[in-house]
């Protein structure tokens, strides 16, 4: 599972850099200030969790069910949270808002909270 966490850490890190540059250089002319701020929030959370997965991938070396749940919750949470924001912002900018993505963002946030909560639990 550590290899998967490290793989996703690298993927999230690389795509966050790409999407951050995309937002800063291309989307800034097409998005409102509010939309750009939302897009940047997605990028920030993605890079934060890339770093967390990278650190945990090297630190949590035991293959326990709890570590697996932590990794999965953080990976699923990052995908649902950040990528739903990207979809909402880009579709909204094209006047074709994809409404079903709206409820996905907080579900992603819940997965992130679960991952952090499980990590906290391992230290208790």
Predicted regions and their residues:
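Polytopic transmembrane helical bundles with strong interfacial aromatic enrichment
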Residues: 1-124
């Amino acid at each position: 599972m550590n290899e998967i966490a490290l793989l996703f850490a690298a993927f999230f890190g690389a795509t966050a850099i790409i999407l951050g540059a995309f937002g800063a250089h291309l989307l800034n002319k097409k998005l409102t200030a509010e939309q750009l701020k939302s897009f940047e929030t997605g990028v920030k959370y993605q890079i934060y969790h890339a770093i967390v997965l990278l650190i945990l991938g090297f630190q949590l070396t035991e293959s326990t069910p709890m570590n697996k749940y932590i990794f999965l919750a953080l990976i699923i949470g990052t995908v649902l949270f950040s990528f739903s924001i990207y979809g909402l912002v880009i579709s909204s900018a094209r006047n074709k808002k994809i409404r079903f993505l709206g409820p996905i963002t907080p579900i992603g946030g819940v997965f992130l909270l679960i991952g952090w909560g499980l990590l906290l639990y391992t230290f208790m």
